[in-house]
Design a protein with these regions (language model features):
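Membrane-proximal N-terminal segments immediately preceding the first transmembrane helix
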Residues: 4-24, 454-468, 507, 527-532, ...
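Intrinsically disordered, low-complexity juxtamembrane tails/stalks of eukaryotic membrane proteins
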Residues: 66-79, 91, 120, 138, ...
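Phosphate/adenylate-binding glycine loop and adjacent helical scaffold
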Residues: 138, 382-471, 482-484
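Histidine-centered active-site microenvironments of extracellular/periplasmic hydrolases
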Residues: 284-341, 347, 351
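Structural motif
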Residues: 77-79, 231-235, 283, 309
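Active-site-proximal alpha/beta segments of enzymes that process anionic O-linked groups
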Residues: 12-21, 30-48, 71-77, 84-230, ...
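A long, amphipathic alpha-helix that forms part
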Residues: 4-14, 26-33, 50, 63, ...
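Alpha-helical transmembrane segments of integral membrane proteins
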Residues: 35-52, 472-986
Length: 986
């Protein structure tokens, strides 16, 4: 009887003399494939930093000095860290406004609006946008967030002197290496979340007031303060700290709004009385807002909308709103919020003109008020709605802003052109010089309106040109990496087809057609020549070394694929010769596989997909079994119920709440499952649907009390959870004896499965019991129940496969009396892979992912509950705590891989062949995550996108290591084959 392989029926067999050579060839090639896979995924993992996280900052531009008289001699920048726009503008419950002084400024002295921040809405990127005029440098993700990772220009750099007081996390970024600055910060210890942090704001003001008072007795300091181009920066951290600790609806946070308003009033009065020249400009704003939960970082309006109030020298006075002010610009701010958003009625400011800006627009505004060159890296647009200047001066200010952005564009263009052999310029700015000349001519002709319009158009084109060169190499790199991944997957498929499947006789008739590369020299030569040409081009373009690696890996893979030209050609002819229903079946398998893998991709952000998955799979699998085997066996019902039980866990919160009663109950549940498994192992073997997985021999076990010992350890771990939690609740220190017992129980219980019987069910039952104690001791809530539910589903998977195996053998034996296994086996009692075997790696992928997402997600890991490691360690030790957390995450993975290994033995399929299919599935997901990497958004969003891609890329190593680890437990599992009545060792 022919045996159906992935791509056909067996027509002939290899000679006995060729089997050793084939084994050696397969072994060498697989070793080489694993090494290649590790290197390839490591190299390609780094590609995202060249594609998505390249710094936009360039150096070497000339400053653009403004051609107008500065309206102000000095400028005061007040930044209320973490102040939400709505909490600043809205009244309190008694209809009194929290910022009376600044509201008076809005109505009588200056201009106001909402400053729109771009995610990540954090303190450092927010201040960089305000003071330097550009948004978060994406390359900072590789260098750390707190410290300033790259050199950049700022308004402070261009000032004659800068005075700054505030947080040690912010002030040193801008003033730490600035020689013409006077600054001070309070100690980190002052940032105590248990207190009202508004005193930090008072500290900053007191330092500045003390400086002014000292100047009356210090002539040198007095002269310094009398200079023009002076910048005063007060960083007011109180709202941020109080928002984190007490939430933005708390009385402490709302009172802090009054504190910063009072500080703004005192700073204004202090300086007006000190200078008495009306030459001081004032800007009050915030770096980001604060969510209702007391956090920030993402693009929610509560985080991106911040107040902006500007008054003093060079600033327009308030203007009533007119009908034309509400025209729809159909434009969006940097946070994707529309222009002309209606002002809430409760703010009572809808009658006064509102001028919203992007956060980076504040930097050119400050430069213009002081008559300074804009920071050379700024991408902000000067908001003319704030500056009070003559029409000619307004055009000059916008032109200076335009030239500064244009200089960045020209510098990037110059750098790229000097390194490119086939340079593609940004065509819309090919005639930028004539546009500048035209603006100058319009200025000379005093046609200021036309000059303004042309300047703004040129500025807009320059910003688009910056984006063009920022993403200049993106398409080539993404295409190269994508082709590399596709080449790797094609190469894997070819290897699996050659090594683990039965193919038609015309492909296998001549052994050398498969194993010997008689005409591969041409392909190798072409690949080497092509790589040499590409390397020379990359070298001449001064490309980074990693660019060479990206291209080399991709070219190498496709060269190897071309080496298999004869095999691919024969395979194509074979497929073309098959019936259409077979091709449809093959295509259907591919489509279903991709759909399942795409659902897994989306499950990384939506855990509830697993609920629907297991509800549907449980029903379909049980119906399928119900039609194939008698319902009295109980297996269809068991499969359905266990899948539905597991589906509940992805509906539960990712942040696991404390519930130690559940942990204790889970210990009982694990013992009951283990006891049931033990009974079935001893008594269910006579049932034909359990045949092969139970311990059939009635011989005395090597360690007759092993099960009782394991059950005892599970019970002890539940008791220790109760005792440890009781001590913590009573605020008592964990006893050393308890700590030692927990370590002993967790460690010793994992060794015991090695001494269990080597029947499939008995060994897996022992592994389940062996890893339960450490998992229970590291659990704080429902994840302990999940452990039992996952174990039940894994048993259901094994029973499902065993039932299918039985039905398949019955059907085949009724069709033919021949020995089904004859000629269909590779070696070591493993058969060739069949088309239907693709369900094994797909099921593994689903269970492997649910082992992680069943109890949380990436965000919940980042904010794990410290009490989960309290039973092992009470003294803060980040490395040991992280190790315990990672080990806890690994335990469900280990269970899944043990079940996977057992199934490959049960079905007599090659485990390494299935491993390559798992990697193939992983790489389909990896390519998707490659295109989902983000360099904008909150740090959590950026970090999660990198984590998703990185984890899938690392799976080639991760799964292999877990295979090696679990092989210690599964290598001697024995399966009894009904057809041969023999035992096979894994």
């Amino acid at each position: 009887m022919d045996v159906d392989g992935i791509l056909g029926n067996r027509d002939s067999k290899l000679g006995k003399s060729s089997i050793p050579r084939r084994r050696q060839w397969v072994k060498r090639r697989e070793t080489w494939l694993v090494i290649l896979g590790v290197v390839l995924h490591a190299v390609y993992m780094l590609s995202i930093f060249d594609i998505y996280f390249k710094t936009p900052i360039v150096h070497g531009m000339d400053l653009v000095s403004p051609r107008f008289s500065p309206p102000a001699k000095r400028l005061v920048l007040l930044v209320a860290d973490g102040l939400r726009a709505d909490k600043f503008f809205e009244p309190d419950l008694e209809a009194n406004f929290r910022a009376p002084f600044l509201r008076n400024v809005i109505k009588n002295q200056g201009r106001w609006g909402v400053s729109h921040a771009r995610p990540p809405t954090e303190s450092r990127p927010g201040h960089v946008a305000i003071i330097a005029g550009f948004y978060e440098d994406p390359s900072a993700v590789t260098k750390g967030w707190k410290a300033n990772p790259v050199e950049f220009d700022s308004v402070f750099n261009r000032s004659r002197h800068t005075i700054s007081y505030g947080s040690p996390d912010i002030v040193p970024i801008f003033c730490g290496a600035l020689p013409h600055s006077t600054w001070a910060t309070y100690p980190h210890e002052f940032e105590d979340f248990a207190t009202d942090a508004s005193f930090l704001d008072e500290w900053s003001f007191d330092q500045f007031q003390s400086l002014l008072n000292r100047s009356n007795e210090d002539p040198k300091l007095k002269r310094l303060l009398e200079q023009d181009n002076l910048v005063v920066f007060l960083h007011l951290l109180g709202c941020d700290s109080n928002g984190h600790a007490h939430r933005p609806f708390s009385s402490i946070y709302l009172n802090n709004v009054k504190v910063v308003d009072h500080i703004a009033e005192r700073v204004y009065n202090l300086l007006e009385n000190y200078y008495k020249d009306n030459r001081t400009s004032y800007i009050f704003t915030a770096d980001h807002g604060m969510s209702d939960k007391g956090s920030h970082g993402d693009g929610h309006p509560s985080n991106t909308d911040t107040p902006l109030v500007v008054w003093g020298a060079g600033v327009k006075h308030p203007r009533p709103v007119t009908a034309k002010d509400h025209s729809d610009h159909v434009l969006r701010f940097i946070d994707q919020h529309l222009h002309d958003a209606p002002t809430p009625k409760e703010w009572d400011l809808d009658g006064i003109e509102r001028v919203d800006v992007n956060q980076a627009d504040i930097a050119p505004l400050m430069s213009t008020l002081l008559g300074l060159p804009c920071p050379v890296n700024s991408v902000g647009n000067l908001p003319l709605g704030y500056v009070d200047m003559k029409e000619e001066e307004e055009v000059e200010a916008v032109l200076a802003n335009t030239k500064q952005i244009l200089n960045q564009f020209l510098r990037k263009s110059q750098i790229k052109q000097s390194h490119s052999l086939f340079f593609k310029p940004f065509k819309p700015l090919a005639s930028y010089f004539s546009m500048l000349n035209q603006i100058e001519e319009l200025l000379s002709a005093r046609d200021y309106k036309a000059a303004m319009q042309l300047s703004e158009n040129l500025r807009s084109l320059a910003l688009k040109g910056l984006h063009y060169f920022q993403t200049y190499d993106l398409l080539v790199l993404m295409a190269t990496i994508t082709l590399g991944y596709i080449g790797w997957m094609v190469f894997l498929v070819l290897h699996v087809l050659q090594a683990y499947t039965l193919l038609p006789g015309d492909i296998f008739r001549k052994e050398e057609a498969v194993h010997e590369k008689s005409n591969t020299g041409k392909a190798q030569l072409c690949g080497c020549l092509f790589m040499a040409v590409v390397s020379v081009l990359l070298f001449l373009e001064h490309s980074p070394p990693l660019y060479h690696a990206y291209f080399a890996m991709t070219i190498f893979l496709w060269t190897q694929i071309l080496n298999e030209y004869k095999f691919i050609k024969a395979l194509w002819r074979y497929l073309c010769g098959r019936k259409s229903n077979y091709v449809i079946k093959l295509l259907a398998l591919g489509v279903v596989s991709v759909i399942i893998l795409e659902l897994l991709v989306h499950s990384f952000t939506e855990r509830k997909l697993y609920t629907w998955c297991f509800l549907i799979v449980g029903a379909i699998a049980s119906i399928y079994l119900y039609k194939s085997i008698p319902w009295r066996s109980g297996i269809p019902v068991f499969v359905c119920l266990t899948c539905w039980f597991l589906s509940l866990f992805t509906l539960m919160p990712a942040e696991i709440p404390d519930n130690n009663k559940l942990v204790n109950a889970s210990g009982v549940m694990v013992i009951v499952i283990g006891l049931t498994g033990k009974w079935l192992d001893l008594n269910a073997g006579v049932n034909r649907f359990w045949f092969g997985i139970c311990n059939h021999e009635k011989r005395k076990p090597r360690f007759p009390m092993l099960f009782q010992l394991q059950a005892l350890f599970v019970g002890l771990s539940s008791v220790m959870v109760f005792l440890s939690t009781s001590h913590r609740t009573e605020k008592q220190e964990l006893h050393t004896i308890h700590q030692l017992m927990n370590w002993f129980i967790a460690g010793f219980s994992m060794i015991l499965p090695l001494f269990s019987e080597n029947g499939l069910l008995s060994r897996l039952n022992s592994i389940f019991l062996g890893f339960a104690p450490p998992f229970l001791l590291l659990s704080i809530g429902y994840e302990a129940v999940f452990y039992g539910a996952l174990g039940l589903v894994l048993i259901a998977w094994i029973l499902f496969e065993n039932s299918l195996l039985y039905v398949h053998k019955v059907n085949k034996s009724s069709a033919s009396g021949k020995n089904l296994g004859e000629h269909a086996f590779l070696e070591n009692d493993t058969r060739y892979l069949q088309l239907s075997d693709m369900r094994i790696p797909l099921t593994f992928m689903v269970l492997f992912n649910v082992a992680f997402f069943g109890t949380g997600n990436f965000a919940s890991i980042a904010s794990f509950e410290i009490s989960s490691v309290y039973r092992f360690i009470t003294v803060f030790s980040p490395f040991l705590m992280a190790a315990l957390l990672i080990f806890k995450l690994f335990i469900p993975f280990l269970l899944v891989i043990c079940a996977f290994s057992a199934i490959t033995k049960l079905l007599e399929v090659p485990r390494i062949g299935c491993y390559f299919l798992v990697i193939l599935c992983s790489d389909v997901m990896t390519i998707h995550f490659f295109f989902l990497v983000k360099n904008t958004g909150s740090w959590m969003e950026i970090g999660n996108s990198i984590s998703h891609f990185g984890i899938m890329s690392a799976q080639v190593v991760f799964v292999l290591l877990l295979f090696a680890l679990t092989n210690i437990y599964t290598k001697d599992i024995e399966i009894r084959s009904g057809s041969r009545d023999s035992r096979k060792v894994m």
